[in-house]
From Swiss-Prot:
Pathway: Cofactor biosynthesis; NAD(+) biosynthesis; NAD(+) from deamido-NAD(+) (ammonia route): step 1/1. ATP binds at residues 47-54, 161, 190, 212. This is NH(3)-dependent NAD(+) synthetase. The keyword Thylakoid does not apply. Homodimer. It comes from Enterococcus faecalis (strain ATCC 700802 / V583). SUPFAM superfamilies: Adenine nucleotide alpha hydrolases-like. Mg(2+) binds at residues 53, 166.
Length: 275
């Protein structure tokens, strides 16, 4: 009988070991194949935070676009990187370091604070009080609104940064950073993503940085591992089919079950995964 761990590994396509160079090539070719199949698409759009995931996805996207231009002679193929801070970002230096590494064709900066604060104000005027946690999700959704707005004006597709360690724990905002058109990191766990950045020659600080969602005003820069109650090493071991402690296994599988709704399109009468 298949265990839940085995089911999750199969579902997310995680391999116990990888060749980083091969996986880099696989992701770039995947992005290029999508563009070739959809010739009306000319850009990829991605928000760059300064964290491991957007840095990796951004560099892969830029490499794919560079190759598309070289192979087709079509100079309209462009990667658009967007900085999407809420006001002043505490780790802005990391974001700038990521952009310097990615070297995007186009770099934009859009402050989401006015839009988020205006919506919070409108809701409060209507008698709806917004918690800090809920406001954090609004920030994530405003970032996705912005990316799709830019993509819509530039014949673009939005790249998502979802990977296996994030997906299994559903550690993303529904219709926020969970909303995207294409996921070049899907199948990789956290340490494998780190290995790809090393292969690509990224500065060490960009892949050794402590991962954080940094969405809540009252709890700035809270580490993902603190919020999840489990380390990425344990999550990665689990996804590679290794034995982890009973506590870690239970925590990971509880997050997986709790977040099932995030992995599905809106529920219809024919869906039964939630029962």
């Amino acid at each position: 009988m298949t265990t839940l761990q085995e089911k999750i590994i199969q579902e997310l396509g995680v391999l116990p070991t990888i060749d980083p160079k091969e996986e880099v090539r696989k992701s770039i070719d995947f992005l290029k194949a999508y563009l070739t199949k959809h010739p009306f698409l000319k850009t990829f759009v991605l928000g760059i935070s300064g964290g491991q995931d957007s840095t990796l996805a951004g560099r892969l996207a830029q490499l794919a676009m560079t190759e598309m231009r070289e192979e087709t002679g079509d100079m309209s193929y462009q990667f658009i990187a967007i900085r999407l801070p809420y006001g002043e970002q505490a780790d802005e230096a990391d974001a700038q370091a990521a952009l310097a590494f990615i070297q995007p064709d186009v770099s934009l900066r859009v402050d989401i604070k006015p839009a988020v604060d205006a919506m919070v104000g409108s809701l409060e005027n209507a008698g709806v009080q917004i918690s800090d946690f809920n406001k954090g999700n609004m920030k994530a959704r405003q970032r996705m609104i912005t990316q799709y707005a830019v993509a819509g004006e530039n014949a673009g597709a939005v790249i998502g940064t979802d990977h296996a360690a994030e997906n299994v724990t559903a550690f993303f905002t529904k219709y926020g950073d969970g909303g995207a058109d294409i996921l070049p990191l899907f199948r990789l766990n956290k340490r494998q993503g780190k290995a790809l950045l090393k292969e690509l020659g990224a500065p060490e600080a960009l892949y050794l940085k402590i991962p954080t969602a940094d969405l809540e005003d009252d709890k700035p820069l809270v580490a993902d591992e603190v919020a999840l109650g489990v380390t990425y090493d344990a999550i990665d071991d689990y996804l590679e089919g290794k034995k982890v402690s009973e506590t870690d296994q239970q925590t990971i599988e509880n997050w997986y079950k709790k977040g099932q709704h995030k992995r599905h399109l809106p529920i219809t009468i024919f869906d039964d995964f939630w029962k």
